[in-house]
Amino acid sequence: GGGGGSGETSGMWFGPRL
């Protein structure tokens, strides 16, 4: 959803912020 990362859920990022 934002910030980058390997995936997204409920509009929130999760995973490494690359």
Curated annotation (Swiss-Prot):
GO biological process: neuropeptide signaling pathway
A Gene Ontology term for the protein's cellular component: extracellular region
Entry keyword annotation includes Secreted: yes
Modified sites of kind Leucine amide: 18
Coiled coil spans: none
Disulfide bonds: none
Main localisation: secreted
Keyword annotations: Amidation, Neuropeptide, Secreted
InterPro entries: Pyrokinin_CS
Matching PROSITE patterns: PYROKININ (PS00539)
GO molecular function, one term: neuropeptide hormone activity
Keyword Ribonucleoprotein part of the UniProt annotation: no
Compartments (UniProt record): Secreted
Physiological role: Myoactive.
Family per similarity comment: Belongs to the pyrokinin family.
Protein name, entry field: Pyrokinin-5
